[in-house]
From Swiss-Prot:
It is found in: Cytoplasm. Its EC number is 2.4.2.7. InterPro entries: Ade_phspho_trans, PRibTrfase_dom, PRTase-like, UPRTase/APRTase. Homodimer. It comes from Streptococcus gordonii (strain Challis / ATCC 35105 / BCRC 15272 / CH1 / DL1 / V288). This is Adenine phosphoribosyltransferase. SUPFAM superfamilies: PRTase-like. It catalyses: AMP + diphosphate = 5-phospho-alpha-D-ribose 1-diphosphate + adenine. Catalyzes a salvage reaction resulting in the formation of AMP, that is energically less costly than de novo synthesis. Pathway: Purine metabolism; AMP biosynthesis via salvage pathway; AMP from adenine: step 1/1. One of its GO terms (cellular component) is cytoplasm. The gene is apt. Keywords: Cytoplasm, Glycosyltransferase, Purine salvage, Transferase.
Length: 170
């Protein structure tokens, strides 16, 4: 199945000069959505994953069904002020400044093998901050999986030695 057939391309969104890749059509098609989830589950199967972690918001959309299929838990990564209990945080660079991500301080137990799942790998800032928090909690990042990678933004360089899978390249 060619998953790119289920990605809408919107020029100049959310601002002039940006090409937005919208995964909504993929999610709206049960066969395509299921296929994408199964591809990530297959990647994760041999990695002995204990927990899936996904950054808001689209990391939830992809990560939760992966965790469900693997029969394991899911831990959300959110912006500050969105999680009700004690959190840890990590800053990351954005185009026009610094932003912060958080996760519950008890989300990952030391030694747990974690799969990070998100819809998009662009500059790598989100995944870098997520890796930092997982490792601070004693987790092992066993892999990362993305629906889409925007190759020209070089996010793979940020991932470095971590294993990862991408379903579509743009």
């Amino acid at each position: 199945m060619n998953l790119k057939d289920y990605i809408a391309t919107i020029e100049n969104y959310p601002k002039e000069g940006v090409t937005f890749r919208d995964i909504s059509p993929l999610m709206a098609d049960g066969n395509a959505y299921s296929y994408a989830v199964r591809e990530i589950v297959q990647y994760a199967t041999d990695k002995k994953i204990d927990m899936v972690v996904g950054p808001e918001a689209r990391g939830f959309i992809v990560g939760c069904p992966v965790a469900f299929e693997l029969g394991i838990g899911f831990a959300p990564v959110r912006k500050p002020g969105k999680l009700p209990r004690e959190v840890i945080s990590a800053d990351y660079e954005k185009e026009y400044g610094v932003d912060t991500l958080t996760m519950h301080a008890d989300a990952i137990k030391p030694g747990q093998r974690v799969l990070i799942v998100d819809d998009l790998l662009a500059t790598g800032g989100t995944v870098k901050a997520t890796i930092e928090m997982i490792e601070r909690l004693g987790g092992i990042v066993a892999g990362c999986a993305f629906l889409i990678e925007l190759d020209e933004l070089k996010g793979r360089e940020v991932i470095g030695e971590y294993d990862y899978k991408v379903l579509m390249h743009y």
